[in-house]
């Protein structure tokens, strides 16, 4: 594999591990020319459905867009990168399981929101506010109230 730093063609695998979700192999590589190290991921190439946008146009499913949108919602939140990768892998699996050749962008957005809900409630609210185009504070309050009803009441701990 070509080194991303010096473009030399000769690199060696220093370490190889299966990712947490088992969907990828993480490899640490070292360039024999510049001695720098870098990480690569090996994944199965899947034939995911095309995404049909709101305007009717179609585009290829892009894992990087899903990861980027989740990372933006999770910015400065205590969620590991492996957890994001696992969530995206679950979304891909759900899309493959449908057997459909196309998926509407609205459905894809709902899948992302469901995964964020399980990862971090703040990120879920952030994503939902953009995805659902919240107009005022009451819409935030509605989502927060939805969480309160869904989760059991927590009693404050005595100190």
Curated annotation (Swiss-Prot):
The keyword Metal-binding applies. It holds the Pfam family ATP-cone. Keywords: ATP-binding, DNA-binding, Metal-binding, Nucleotide-binding, Repressor, Transcription, Transcription regulation, Zinc, Zinc-finger. Its cofactor is Zn(2+). GO terms for molecular function: ATP binding; DNA binding; zinc ion binding. A zinc finger (unnamed) spans 3-34. Binds 1 zinc ion. Residues 49-139 form the ATP-cone domain. GO terms for biological process: negative regulation of DNA-templated transcription. Negatively regulates transcription of bacterial ribonucleotide reductase nrd genes and operons by binding to NrdR-boxes. Belongs to the NrdR family. HAMAP family: NrdR. This is Transcriptional repressor NrdR. It comes from Burkholderia cenocepacia (strain HI2424). The lineage of its organism: Bacteria, Pseudomonadati, Pseudomonadota, Betaproteobacteria, Burkholderiales. The gene is nrdR.
């Amino acid at each position: 594999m070509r080194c991303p730093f010096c473009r030399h063609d000769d690199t060696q695998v220093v370490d190889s591990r299966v990712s947490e979700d088992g969907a990828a192999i993480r490899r640490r590589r070292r360039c024999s020319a510049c001695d720098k190290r870098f990480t690569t991921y090996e994944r199965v190439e899947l034939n995911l459905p095309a995404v049909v946008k709101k305007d009717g146009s179609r585009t290829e499913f892009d894992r990087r867009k899903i990861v980027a949108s989740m990372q933006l919602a999770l910015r400065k939140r205590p969620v590991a990168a492996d957890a994001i990768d696992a969530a995206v892998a679950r979304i891909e699996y759900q899309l493959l399981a449908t057997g459909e050749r196309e998926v509407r962008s609205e459905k894809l957005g709902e899948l992302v929101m469901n995964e964020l809900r399980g990862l971090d409630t703040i990120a879920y609210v952030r994503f939902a506010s953009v995805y659902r185009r919240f107009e005022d504070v009451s819409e935030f309050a509605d989502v927060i109230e939805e969480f309160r009803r869904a989760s059991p009441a927590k009693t404050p701990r005595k100190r």
